[in-house]
Design a protein with these regions (language model features):
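Structural motif
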Residues: 15-19, 66-68, 104-108, 143-149, ...
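Repeated scaffold domains used in trafficking and secretory/extracellular systems
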Residues: 45-53, 82-94, 122-133, 167-175, ...
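Hydrophobic beta-strand positions that form the internal "hydrophobic ladder"
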Residues: 59, 96, 135-136, 179-182, ...
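Residue-level marker for isolated small/hydroxyl-bearing positions within beta-strands
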Residues: 62, 99, 137-139, 185, ...
Length: 266
């Protein structure tokens, strides 16, 4: 059925001008929609989950070096044994990245199959995936404190940002819902004080815009539907305007001396 659906998608989308990976994403969507729901509960095979991320009509679960993908109806779609020493995942709408934080390899996976496997020049520390399929990768660098590379949905290099020690090392990243901008929270040490610098990187220009700095570590950040960016630091929550001449902090809420330990995004 997958082969038949692939052929139909190729004709329906005029795939001569579109990527095979995008066609596979569309086939995945059709397969998930047409497959009978197995229902819940299910034994995923992962007894101690390290991370779970939602995608369109599905989710990916990681435990140790194992990953499984299930539809929201309970159908098993994919299973991966990476062998990575320190695996991590980052998910977008229809694909996710499985990467090794103790190595230089990453895998771009659709909901049912591998799309790309890439070996970087140095150790990977962080990845993010856009809903439109772009992938941001942070690696070690001999020329700067960190190197951030953004790839398009076909894993072709789109832009590179070599961060200085003053700019910091990216700790968290989040693509905007329209996949045209990337928010980057980078930490640096200034005078013995840990500082978080928050940037927005327009993918069409590649020139980062600094939204502000905070003497606290970001625990979570995400884009709001109106283009604002919400960042949850250890000591307060801050809402940022990300565009125009008024880019910067818009509103904040102090935790009153409390410290935020973790965030659950459900």
């Amino acid at each position: 059925i997958v082969a038949v659906l692939t052929i139909l998608v190729l004709f329906a989308t005029g795939a001569v001008g579109s990527s095979i990976a995008r066609a596979k994403d569309l086939v995945d969507t059709a397969v998930i929609a047409l497959a009978p729901a197995a229902g819940w509960p299910q034994q995923t095979g992962i007894t101690d989950p390290d991370a779970v991320a939602q995608m369109s009509g599905s989710f990916v679960e990681m435990g140790g070096d194992s990953c499984v993908v299930y539809s929201l109806g309970g159908t098993r779609l994919n299973s991966i044994q990476s062998g990575y020493a320190r695996p991590a995942i980052a998910a977008g709408k229809t694909r996710f990245v499985l990467y090794n934080r103790s190595g230089n390899e990453l895998r771009v996976e659709s909901r049912t199959q591998n799309l790309y496997t890439k070996t970087m020049d140095s150790t990977i520390s962080l990845c993010a995936v856009a809903d439109a399929g772009q992938v941001a990768v942070v690696t070690d660098s001999t020329d700067s404190v960190a190197k951030l590379t953004v790839y398009n949905s076909s894993m072709q290099q789109q832009l590179v940002w070599n961060l200085t020690s003053e700019q910091g090392t990216p700790l968290r990243m989040a693509f905007a819902p329209d996949s045209r901008r990337l928010a980057v929270a980078a930490v640096s040490a200034v005078g013995g004080q840990l500082t978080t610098n928050l940037y927005v990187l327009p993918l069409s220009q590649g020139d980062p815009v600094c939204l502000g700095s905070e003497n606290s570590v970001p625990q979570w950040m995400g884009w709001m539907s109106n283009g604002f960016l919400l960042v949850l630091y250890e000591n307060r929550a801050v809402l940022y305007n990300t565009s125009g001449g008024s880019a910067g902090e818009r509103a904040s809420y102090d935790f009153g001396g409390g410290t935020l330990v973790s965030v659950s995004n459900t």
